[in-house]
């Protein structure tokens, strides 16, 4: 089934729309996103932390003039927090009112208590609400942090854009949302989930692409500073670190140094701001001193 109503006319047009939101997508990612829109298929993104998986959903929502609904996954995430739950307090109050006014037959009371008036819709159900008139981008972020049981629950949603509620029946989207799932590969996600999605691995960008990203996202930074910071981050990615800096750290570092009115990179500036790019004490201690000077020298001669 082709749902072209929310799709750009071409891959190039989609790339331009993302660029208008300051998101620089390579060709492979743009093709995958275009097909996800055209075919109404979920898009599963894997890659290291900080390479732009989550921000793609934000950029796509803005580019498509859609509502972004985000579900942040975590260990122990369940249906009540992700999909729906019943408003038990209101149901109990309604039950007491029914009892006080003569009550209903048990079957009628059940219909009265289990209807949409008492349903608390969580992100997944909100995204496929048939009454929703605006487009939706549903971001299921860091699915690898959730339990395998929760993955199993997602299969119906990903395959049919519907959710079955035992007391109400099946809720189906009238307009399929664009579903983007992300994973940092802290564990392997089950094949059954991946089979229902288009798949895209996002690499760390090339130096030239990362420079384009920095220019788009931190345009006020001095060009020389941006180039030097980007080169230094690329050097750091070649060092054995506990937490390798991603593109988000490059952007934060350039923005931080620009906020300090730095125009070029030197050891003092790096020492002052290492906590912006390295997020582990052992990593900071490991590269300080002579090692940092060597890394900076290599970066400045790129």
Annotated model-derived regions:
Residues 1-302:
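C-terminal regulatory/interaction module of P-loop NTP-utilizing enzymes
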